[in-house]
């Protein structure tokens, strides 16, 4: 079945005498629609003339005939008015005679592939993500729907044309290496029958090889290599899932972190947000400053300002020891004693109770208690009948009893020699006064020599 027959059945416009055998139908079909330019822009945007692929000379003759008929076709729709409407069942499919050449059979096979594609895709003349070159208006079926003869069925108008334009922009940015990487495992496939419309191609796994830098060449593409003026789009669109995944890897806040898994070194790598040069460089870490010195929490006093306590880490400084000086010693030598006037030290006070400071009652109490015998007694040191020192003496806790015998002997001597007054040995007792002590000492010094020897022998230890 030719392209004109497919279009007549899909658009559901009755054609009575518009079809001619041997491929002459397209010329008369132009007269059924008023404006042939709109039809060429909308329906022939799939480039059916180019899709004939120039297989053989009979096909070329048909194409030239179609071109002449298109030029000579009238611009008005009076031919359609003369023909009149007819039911859709009276439209038999156009069958080409078996006398056609083998090239015409291949053309029919190719056109059968367009049969299912043109059912839902008449308004969408191009598969998704293909560059539109010959369609000037974004809504191609608007001119066809303006006809008042018989309204065409409502075809799904694309709401995401802007999305397709954005997809084409993304496609321009992510061509060659990335697309080849994502689609390198897919094999070239022939026309898919029972293919749904453009919207339903999502998830079908179809691939459009027209976007490749080095597309896979098929037998039909080799045959149409002579026509360099037209671009032959392959009706199989690329899988949108791969482009979605590609879009996600190049957009969003995490786009700079998602890199392709494998990079092809032979292909030139385009500058993209996933390149390593665009990554923000982490500045070097600033070294941590040393901890400040511990503040002084003590009270503000003389200790804080002193040099001794200025540094807490070190112990307080101890002044060096000076050599011991004899003058500061606690036990000085006799040579360092101070010299008194005339070289004589004043007499030492005795420990006996002095009657000047002790009351008579205290003395009576001591005598009544029998403490008179325990009064300390002071004996001077006498050598050779002379008192040796006025500062040193013997301190006895009490009067010794043998002094009474000596005192009795002194009395007998005095009686025998009355001219010599010999006093008994003075014993500075608690009851003797200071004047009596001095008088007794003077008397002892004036005593005889023999007695002094005796006294010195007795008293000195």
Curated annotation (Swiss-Prot):
<keyword id="KW-0539">Nucleus</keyword>
<dbReference type="GO" id="GO:0007175">
    <property type="term" value="P:negative regulation of epidermal growth factor-activated receptor activity"/>
</dbReference>
<dbReference type="GO" id="GO:1903243">
    <property type="term" value="P:negative regulation of cardiac muscle hypertrophy in response to stress"/>
</dbReference>
<keyword id="KW-0007">Acetylation</keyword>
<dbReference type="GO" id="GO:1904565">
    <property type="term" value="P:response to 1-oleoyl-sn-glycerol 3-phosphate"/>
</dbReference>
<dbReference type="GO" id="GO:0043491">
    <property type="term" value="P:phosphatidylinositol 3-kinase/protein kinase B signal transduction"/>
</dbReference>
<dbReference type="GO" id="GO:0010467">
    <property type="term" value="P:gene expression"/>
</dbReference>
<dbReference type="Pfam" id="PF11555">
    <property type="entry name" value="Inhibitor_Mig-6"/>
</dbReference>
<dbReference type="GO" id="GO:0035847">
    <property type="term" value="P:uterine epithelium development"/>
</dbReference>
<feature type="modified residue" description="Phosphoserine">
    <location>
        <position position="251"/>
    </location>
</feature>
<feature type="compositionally biased region" description="Pro residues">
    <location>
        <begin position="283"/>
        <end position="292"/>
    </location>
</feature>
<protein>
    <recommendedName>
        <fullName>ERBB receptor feedback inhibitor 1</fullName>
    </recommendedName>
</protein>
<dbReference type="GO" id="GO:0032355">
    <property type="term" value="P:response to estradiol"/>
</dbReference>
<dbReference type="GO" id="GO:0048286">
    <property type="term" value="P:lung alveolus development"/>
</dbReference>
<feature type="modified residue" description="Phosphothreonine">
    <location>
        <position position="126"/>
    </location>
</feature>
<dbReference type="InterPro" id="IPR052112">
    <property type="entry name" value="EGFR_SigReg_Kinase"/>
</dbReference>
<dbReference type="GO" id="GO:0060428">
    <property type="term" value="P:lung epithelium development"/>
</dbReference>
<keyword id="KW-0963">Cytoplasm</keyword>
<feature type="modified residue" description="Phosphoserine">
    <location>
        <position position="272"/>
    </location>
</feature>
<dbReference type="GO" id="GO:0048545">
    <property type="term" value="P:response to steroid hormone"/>
</dbReference>
<dbReference type="GO" id="GO:0043588">
    <property type="term" value="P:skin development"/>
</dbReference>
<dbReference type="GO" id="GO:0050673">
    <property type="term" value="P:epithelial cell proliferation"/>
</dbReference>
<dbReference type="GO" id="GO:0060426">
    <property type="term" value="P:lung vasculature development"/>
</dbReference>
<dbReference type="GO" id="GO:0050732">
    <property type="term" value="P:negative regulation of peptidyl-tyrosine phosphorylation"/>
</dbReference>
<dbReference type="GO" id="GO:0006699">
    <property type="term" value="P:bile acid biosynthetic process"/>
</dbReference>
<dbReference type="GO" id="GO:0060429">
    <property type="term" value="P:epithelium development"/>
</dbReference>
<dbReference type="GO" id="GO:0019901">
    <property type="term" value="F:protein kinase binding"/>
</dbReference>
<keyword id="KW-0472">Membrane</keyword>
<dbReference type="GO" id="GO:0060613">
    <property type="term" value="P:fat pad development"/>
</dbReference>
<dbReference type="GO" id="GO:0007173">
    <property type="term" value="P:epidermal growth factor receptor signaling pathway"/>
</dbReference>
<feature type="modified residue" description="N-acetylserine">
    <location>
        <position position="2"/>
    </location>
</feature>
<dbReference type="GO" id="GO:0001894">
    <property type="term" value="P:tissue homeostasis"/>
</dbReference>
<feature type="compositionally biased region" description="Polar residues">
    <location>
        <begin position="325"/>
        <end position="336"/>
    </location>
</feature>
<feature type="region of interest" description="Interaction with EGFR and ERBB2 and regulation of EGFR activation">
    <location>
        <begin position="333"/>
        <end position="362"/>
    </location>
</feature>
<dbReference type="GO" id="GO:0072659">
    <property type="term" value="P:protein localization to plasma membrane"/>
</dbReference>
<dbReference type="GO" id="GO:0045616">
    <property type="term" value="P:regulation of keratinocyte differentiation"/>
</dbReference>
<dbReference type="GO" id="GO:0032720">
    <property type="term" value="P:negative regulation of tumor necrosis factor production"/>
</dbReference>
<dbReference type="GO" id="GO:0060065">
    <property type="term" value="P:uterus development"/>
</dbReference>
<keyword id="KW-0597">Phosphoprotein</keyword>
<dbReference type="GO" id="GO:0032691">
    <property type="term" value="P:negative regulation of interleukin-1 beta production"/>
</dbReference>
<comment type="similarity">
    <text>Belongs to the MIG6 family.</text>
</comment>
<dbReference type="GO" id="GO:0005886">
    <property type="term" value="C:plasma membrane"/>
</dbReference>
């Amino acid at each position: 079945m030719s392209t004109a027959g497919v279009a007549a059945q899909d658009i559901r416009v009755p054609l009575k005498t518009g079809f001619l055998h041997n491929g002459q139908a397209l010329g008369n079909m132009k007269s059924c629609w008023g404006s042939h330019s709109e039809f060429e822009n909308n329906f022939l945007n799939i480039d059916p003339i180019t899709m004939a692929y120039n297989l053989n000379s009979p096909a070329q003759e048909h194409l030239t005939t179609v071109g002449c008929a298109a030029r000579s076709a009238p611009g008005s729709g009076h031919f359609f008015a003369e023909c009149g409407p007819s039911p859709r069942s009276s439209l038999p499919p156009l069958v080409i005679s078996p006398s056609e050449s083998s090239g015409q059979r291949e053309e029919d096979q190719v056109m059968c592939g367009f049969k299912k594609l043109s059912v839902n895709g008449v308004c969408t003349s191009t598969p998704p993500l293909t560059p539109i070159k010959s369609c000037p208006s974004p809504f191609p079926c608007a001119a066809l729907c303006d006809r008042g003869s018989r309204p065409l069925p409502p075809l799904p108008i694309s709401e995401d044309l802007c999305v397709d334009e954005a997809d084409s922009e993304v496609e321009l940015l992510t061509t060659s290496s990335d697309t080849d990487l994502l689609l390198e495992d897919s094999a070239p496939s022939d026309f898919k029958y029972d293919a749904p419309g453009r919207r339903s191609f999502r998830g079908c796994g179809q691939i459009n090889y027209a976007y490749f830098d080095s597309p896979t060449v098929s037998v039909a593409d080799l045959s149409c290599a002579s026509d360099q003026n037209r671009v032959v789009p392959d009706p199989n669109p690329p899988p949108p899932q791969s482009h979605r995944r590609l879009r996600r890897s190049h957009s969003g806040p995490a786009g700079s972190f998602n890199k392709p898994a494998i990079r092809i070194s032979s292909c030139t790598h385009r500058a993209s947000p996933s390149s390593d040069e665009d990554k923000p460089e982490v500045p070097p870490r600033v070294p941590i400053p040393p901890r400040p010195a511990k503040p002084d929490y003590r009270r503000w006093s003389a200790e804080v300002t002193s040099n001794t306590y200025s540094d807490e880490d070190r112990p307080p400084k101890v002044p060096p020891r000076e050599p011991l000086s004899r003058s500061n010693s606690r036990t000085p030598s006799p040579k360092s004693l101070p010299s008194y006037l005339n070289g004589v030290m004043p007499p030492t006070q005795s420990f006996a109770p002095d009657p000047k400071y002790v009351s008579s009652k205290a003395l009576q109490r001591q005598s009544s208690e029998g403490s008179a015998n325990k009064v300390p007694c002071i004996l001077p040191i006498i050598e050779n009948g002379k008192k040796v020192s006025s500062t040193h003496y013997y301190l006895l806790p009490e009067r010794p009893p043998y002094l009474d015998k000596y005192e009795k002997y002194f009395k007998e001597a005095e009686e025998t020699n009355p001219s010599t007054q010999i006093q008994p040995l003075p014993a500075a007792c608690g009851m003797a006064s200071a004047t009596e002590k001095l008088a007794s000492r003077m008397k002892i010094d004036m005593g005889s020599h023999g007695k002094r020897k005796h006294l010195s022998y007795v008293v000195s230890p």
